[in-house]
Amino acid sequence: MKKLIILLSVALYACSSSDENPNPIQVDEDNNPPVSQSFTSFLTGKSTDLVTSPDGGVCLMGGSTENDQAMKWFLERANGGDVLVLRATGGDGYNSYFFSELGVTLNSVETIVVKNAEASTEDYIHQKIKNAEAIWFAGGDQWDYISYWRNTPIATLINDAISNRNIVIGGTSAGMAIQGGYYFSAKNGTVTSSTALNNPYDTDVTVESDDFIKNEFLSNVITDTHYDNPDRKGRQVTFMARVLKDSGVQIKGIACDENTAICIDDNGIASVYGQYPDYDDNAYFIQVNPELITVEPENCAPNTPLTWNLDGNAISVYHIKGTEDGNATFDLNDWTTGTGGTWENWYVDNGALID
């Protein structure tokens, strides 16, 4: 009888413990997050959440090596809070870089590597997004991010964090490519400028605008990255021509070279960071020439080279060299006011971009 009472007591205790917290989210004694088949997580810093008031903004980075000054700008806007790194490949390379190498005090840096679309339902990831003051998207393949997260709770929570908690957000390479309201999805793989310019309707020219990441100053923008390796001016101009031809919408373009970053504050002022004049680091703010009445491409059709000439004035571009101090700026409120850059006209003639 005594053994029976003990067994019943143990069973009742186990049941009551489970009922109180059926899905506990916690780290183990070594500060490691739970193991999951759909994601892997790496935590540096404190496992307890620290609530701060982030300053908002967006950091767009063109790929290759990160620009330290732009990364400091990004991290400082978390105001000592928690930074979440989301990626579909790779490991914890950002953790120590963010947490201890840039001189910015943070509560934690956690990298979550998602392995499949099933991760979008994971409560652990949901909670980490809710706790983050900053979210950074690593490079990789943007189609992974789009196919895993678009129209899922993860996208909803990220957008809620942007609009309601004013978190700072950003990404490099593929992580930059998904930040605009329009985006090259790479659903069928990448596409070169030559291919796009010579056939704007090639199956690899996959421009989409279904709701994904909603950044206030990028709702009518398509971004592009690695602009100098290889040259991607032609394909981005083709993306813009396609949208104009197919839907009548005059979208704008933002792009930067590798090792270059564009930091947009919550007032819509974009600052460009790079290492010019030591290196030729460039950023571009591209729009249909606002002074023209007729703006559509002369020839944008399947299996035909693009012509978007309009007497050499089709596209208006504000070109900035990125510097360590990020002093050159462009105003995304009016797409007219800039400091430290130069205006250029680009156009396309029979599949050849002239810039």
PLM features per residue range, with description:
Residues L4-L12:
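Sec-dependent N-terminal signal peptides
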Residues L12-Q37:
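Bacterial Sec-dependent N-terminal signal peptides
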Residues D28-G80, G90, N95, T190-D355:
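C-terminal and late-domain segments of enzyme folds
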Residues E66-Q127:
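ATP/NTP phosphate-donor binding region
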Residues K128, N151-R165:
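Catalytic-core regions built around general acid/base machinery
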Residues W136-G139, I162-Y183:
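Catalytic nucleophile loop
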Residues Q142-T152:
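Glycine/threonine-rich flexible loop motifs
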